[in-house]
């Protein structure tokens, strides 16, 4: 029997970030709705052509989204909060749900599992669902008519969709009965339209599962697939399926897709427990998350073992390709060849699947490949420092209460001190100067002069707004990780390696190919210049080791712990130099602290062990008079508040404005006695919040948090916002702080 290939999650942004440009042009009234949708359809067809031409057999559809695929499902099933009903245009309503408007707060946005992709959390009010728009059918028809190809529509399954809404299990069970008819109607319509195969993504199946969840899933798919002629495949990824035997042998579907790269236990389960003889095994053998070339020898060995269990195998990627840039070819001449030859992005994954298929079906020889060797980029001094770390001795002294008193006496800050997270708006002019400098159109001297002028502007604006602790604005930084990766040894920066983070926001994850170390200052010059302009304290701001690691592509030959420690030691040198040069507040941003948390509970303690140590390693040797801040993005804060406390940062700011109720509930059960700033407004939306809105958040916060420890700040950096809305929002934030201080007089 000849095996086939399929893929899923191909990047939707376009090879030249066409989606980003079209979205931002539409939001800025530069193009019409018709033009935006024409771009979308063009990208859908273009992506399908790329997959088709690579030799992949089963081509996916319904994977394109104008903003987020979970939001697409909310709109498709009419899970639209009532506050958005006043917007009559469906497309504008869709974007308002994602981004908010001046009058309407956006839906919450959070990380998708343990990735750096953000999704829009469903906000389910009515508990009534209806199939309003059949987007999967529309895209199936578009590709059928354009390319004469029958595609495999991809949808998110009901279990994962409801779990993504962050509901308790009682509500998930109740809503599953309500949403099932809408899903059923969708599948019936696809079946009637000639769809032969459908992929239903249920990555929530890799989480730890209770017995009632297993029963719910079994019942859902029994009803969902009843009477259908199309083949239903359940796709899982990011980890091994939980309750393998109970689910895989009982769910009424045609096949299962398993991650055999990050879910090693899947392979063990198949080999020891077997696989249903009447189902297809979709083997995820090429990685959707890391950029390293597939080792064909290892994969062929694994497939030989799988063929002893079942001959019904289809080859695929392990997880959505959306986490990879589009092609390595776009980096030729930019990244050195010996590093480039180690890499494989989305298009190369398609090629790898075809190579494997031909080797199995036709006996074609596998191409000769040198093994990936990171050791040639090693540094003995770095290895020596890592081996001498005493993890039990990484502690700050004295205790927090004494340190904080010393710091606040020295800094002379008022009650409810105000600050921002770090970045200020990066205008077109800022981006142009940076591009001109990188392309050799202006000199380093001209570029630095411009950056220093922007720093002067930012400091002046902050002083005029009467903000207490200032920042330099980060105008020299393209991205909070890329900036440090460019300056540290051991990282490669791509030129076109864009990956979608959310909506129109794209990032370029650096590639860690060797040992990491610091051979020059990273932030000192800009920070000292800003401090020279003002008597107010200016924060030195750096991205922490865990976030740099999590938002990069790590090497695979050593542990993530060791990579994080290498980065932490490099950052520690920078922290101590900033302190030596007179900077009194240093912020180590760790927005991805929780993001890399293993999905299985039994693997989480080990993760927290090295992530906490990485932060402490960066900060433990500073003076007690130096105040250490950290910033984190919200994601299930309640579950990890004790781990965040263990970082022993003097002040933490949290991205919490879209989920403030959930954040505050954490403090009802945990006495957090360090400094804390809960973001008082949402920077992901262009709306300017009122003073009253912010005061309400502060009041709720200080009912649970000691007011002497409470800081007031936005919930994230301001890089993506415009100056007008930034100044207006910060003005209201300072007014809110002053109003709170007056009450305490």
From Swiss-Prot:
GO terms for molecular function: 5-methyltetrahydropteroyltriglutamate-homocysteine S-methyltransferase activity; zinc ion binding. L-homocysteine binds at residues 421-423, 474, 589. SUPFAM superfamilies: UROD/MetE-like. Zn(2+) binds at residues 631, 633, 655, 716. Binds 1 zinc ion per subunit. The active site is at 684 (proton donor). Keywords: Amino-acid biosynthesis, Metal-binding, Methionine biosynthesis, Methyltransferase, Repeat, Transferase, Zinc. Pathway: Amino-acid biosynthesis; L-methionine biosynthesis via de novo pathway; L-methionine from L-homocysteine (MetE route): step 1/1. L-methionine binds at residues 421-423, 474, 589. The keyword Zinc applies. Its cofactor is Zn(2+). It comes from the Bacteria. Its EC number is 2.1.1.14. 5-methyltetrahydropteroyltri-L-glutamate binds at residues 17-20, 111, 505-506, 551, 595. The keyword Cytoplasm does not apply. Gene3D superfamilies: 3.20.20.210. It catalyses: 5-methyltetrahydropteroyltri-L-glutamate + L-homocysteine = tetrahydropteroyltri-L-glutamate + L-methionine. GO terms for biological process: methionine biosynthetic process; methylation. PANTHER family: 5-METHYLTETRAHYDROPTEROYLTRIGLUTAMATE--HOMOCYSTEINE METHYLTRANSFERASE. Belongs to the vitamin-B12 independent methionine synthase family. Catalyzes the transfer of a methyl group from 5-methyltetrahydrofolate to homocysteine resulting in methionine formation. This is 5-methyltetrahydropteroyltriglutamate--homocysteine methyltransferase. It comes from Thermodesulfovibrio yellowstonii (strain ATCC 51303 / DSM 11347 / YP87).
């Amino acid at each position: 029997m000849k095996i086939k290939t399929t893929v899923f999650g191909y990047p939707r942004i376009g090879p030249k970030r066409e989606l980003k440009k079209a979205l931002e042009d539409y939001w800025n009234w530069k193009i019409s709705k018709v033009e935006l949708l024409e771009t979308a359809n063009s990208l859908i067809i273009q992506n399908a052509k790329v997959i088709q031409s690579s030799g992949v057999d089963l081509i996916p559809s319904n994977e394109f989204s104008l903003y987020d695929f979970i939001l697409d499902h909310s709109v498709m099933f009419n899970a639209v909060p009532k506050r958005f009903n006043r917007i009559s245009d469906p497309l504008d309503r869709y974007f308002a749900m994602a981004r908010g408007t001046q009058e309407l707060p956006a839906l919450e946005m959070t990380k998708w599992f343990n990735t750096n992709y953000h999704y829009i959390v469903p906000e389910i009010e009515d508990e009534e669902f209806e199939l309003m728009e059949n987007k999967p059918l529309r895209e199936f028809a578009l590709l059928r008519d354009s390319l004469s190809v029958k595609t495999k529509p991809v949808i998110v399954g009901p279990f994962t969709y409801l779990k993504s809404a962050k509901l308790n299990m009682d509500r998930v069970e109740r809503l599953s009965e309500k949403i099932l008819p809408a899903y059923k109607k969708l599948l019936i319509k696809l079946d009637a339209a000639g769809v032969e195969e459908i992929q239903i993504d249920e990555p929530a199946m890799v989480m730890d599962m209770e017995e009632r969840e297993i029963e719910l899933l079994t019942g859902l798919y029994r009803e969902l697939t009843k009477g259908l002629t199309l083949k239903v495949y359940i796709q899982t990824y990011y980890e091994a399926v939980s309750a393998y035997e109970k689910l895989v042998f009982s769910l009424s579907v045609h096949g299962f897709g398993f991650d055999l790269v990050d879910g090693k236990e899947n392979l063990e389960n198949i080999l020891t427990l077997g696989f249903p003889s009447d189902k297809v095994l979709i083997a995820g053998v090429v990685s959707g998350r890391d950029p390293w070339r597939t080792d064909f020898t290892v994969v062929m060995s694994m497939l030989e073992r799988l063929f002893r269990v079942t001959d019904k195998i289809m080859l695929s990627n392990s997880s959505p390709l959306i986490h990879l840039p589009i092609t390595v070819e776009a980096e030729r001449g930019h990244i050195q060849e010996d590093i480039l030859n180690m890499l494989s992005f989305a298009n190369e994954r398609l090629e790898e699947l075809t190579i494997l298929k031909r080797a199995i079906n036709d006996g074609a020889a596998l191409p000769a490949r040198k093994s990936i060797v990171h050791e040639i980029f090693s540094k003995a001094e770095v290895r020596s420092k890592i081996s001498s770390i005493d993890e039990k001795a990484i502690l700050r002294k004295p205790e927090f209460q004494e340190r904080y008193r010393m710091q606040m006496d020295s800094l002379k800050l008022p009650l409810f001190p105000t600050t921002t997270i770090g970045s200020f708006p990066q205008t077109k002019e800022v981006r142009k100067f940076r591009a001109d400098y990188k392309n050799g159109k202006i000199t380093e001297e001209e570029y630095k002069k411009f950056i220093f002028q922007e720093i002067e502007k930012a400091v002046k604006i902050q002083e005029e707004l009467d903000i207490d602790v200032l920042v330099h604005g980060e105008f020299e930084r393209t991205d909070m990780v890329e900036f440090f990766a460019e300056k540290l040894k051991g990282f490669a920066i791509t030129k076109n390696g864009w990956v979608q983070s959310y909506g129109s926001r794209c990032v370029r994850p650096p590639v860690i190919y060797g040992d990491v170390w610091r051979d020059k200052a990273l932030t000192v010059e800009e920070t000292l210049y800003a401090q020279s302009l003002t008597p107010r304290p200016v924060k030195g701001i750096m991205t922490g080791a865990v976030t740099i690691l999590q938002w990069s592509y790590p090497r695979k030959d050593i542990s993530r712990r060791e990579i994080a420690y290498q980065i932490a030691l490099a950052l520690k040198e920078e922290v101590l130099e900033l302190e030596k040069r007179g900077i009194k507040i240093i912020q180590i941003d760790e927005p991805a602290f929780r993001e890399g948390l293993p999905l299985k509970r039994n693997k989480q303690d080990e993760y927290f062990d090295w992530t906490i140590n990485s932060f402490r390693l960066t900060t433990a040797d500073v003076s007690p008079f130096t105040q250490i801040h950290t910033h984190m993005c919200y994601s299930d804060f309640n579950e990890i508040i004790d781990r965040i406390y263990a970082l022993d940062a003097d002040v933490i700011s949290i991205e919490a404005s879209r989920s403030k109720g959930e954040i505050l509930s954490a403090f009802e059960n945990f006495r957090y006695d360090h400094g804390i700033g809960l973001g008082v407004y949402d920077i992901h939306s262009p709306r300017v919040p009122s003073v009253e809105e912010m005061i309400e958040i502060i009041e709720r916060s200080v009912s649970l948090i000691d007011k002497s420890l409470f800081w007031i700040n936005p919930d994230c950096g301001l890089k993506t916002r415009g100056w007008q809305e930034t100044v207006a929002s910060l003005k209201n934030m300072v007014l809110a702080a002053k109003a709170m201080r007056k009450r305490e007089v």
